[in-house]
């Protein structure tokens, strides 16, 4: 699923959220950044951690929005949380396989600064992304907890959907021996 196949609402939703967190660049520049993210989420090596995963996570953030402090910051963190991805064997062995939250946060920082998002907000987005790697947070960080719930919501599904998740994940890493 690339830019052409992405739902029509997806790119405008990205632009709205980035504007809502303080971006000063025009909508066209924000849209270009969103198109690049859609391309990153749509590479052929992503069998599970793809645009569908991003859309599902955004939907779960929307479900939790009333319980959060800043859902737009959470939405932007969703967009960037897995924008750097590798299923390379060496990356997997080093613990950076799949969605590389640390590299994704660095990408987000550069991109959001370029879009004119205030530095304090950029740091918050990046901290939410990095925290997804550990899934361990302070009890008083509601937005971080909600974002983790949105990310791990993949596991809280019916058995058939979970079976499909496992199948796609195995495809994503089919070049790595199971044992």
Predicted regions and their residues:
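An active-site-proximal "capping" alpha-helix that borders the catalytic cofactor pocket
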Residues: 57, 98-115
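Acidic/histidine metal-binding catalytic segments
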Residues: 30, 69-76, 115-130
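Divalent metal-dependent phosphate-bond-processing catalytic cores, especially two-metal-ion Mg2+/Mn2+ enzymes
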Residues: 2-23, 42-49, 60-70, 80, ...
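His-Asp-centered metal-binding catalytic motifs of divalent-metal-dependent phosphohydrolases/nucleases
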Residues: 57, 72-90, 104, 126-133
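Short catalytic/metal-binding and nucleic-acid-binding patches
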Residues: 26, 30-36, 67, 98-101, ...
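Divalent-cation-assisted or electrostatically stabilized phosphate/pyrophosphate-binding catalytic cores
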Residues: 92-99, 103-106, 172-179
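Active-site flanking loop/helix segments enriched in acidic
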Residues: 31-60, 83-95
């Amino acid at each position: 699923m690339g830019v052409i196949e992405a739902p029509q609402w997806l790119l405008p939703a990205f632009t709205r959220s980035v504007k809502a967190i303080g971006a000063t660049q025009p909508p066209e520049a924000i849209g270009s950044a969103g198109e690049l993210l859609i391309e990153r989420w749509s590479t052929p090596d992503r069998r599970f951690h793809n645009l569908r995963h991003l859309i599902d996570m955004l939907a779960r953030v929307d479900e939790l929005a009333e319980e959060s402090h800043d859902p737009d910051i959470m939405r932007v963190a969703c967009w960037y949380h897995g924008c750097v991805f590798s299923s390379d064997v060496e990356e997997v062995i080093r613990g950076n396989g799949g969605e590389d939250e640390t590299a994704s946060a660095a990408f987000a920082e550069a991109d959001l600064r370029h879009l004119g998002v205030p530095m304090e907000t950029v740091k918050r987005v990046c901290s939410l992304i990095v925290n997804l790697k550990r899934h361990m947070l302070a009890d008083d960080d509601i937005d971080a907890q909600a974002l983790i719930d949105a990310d791990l919501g993949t596991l809280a599904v019916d058995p058939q959907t979970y079976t499909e998740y496992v199948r796609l994940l195995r495809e994503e890493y089919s070049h790595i021996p199971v044992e």
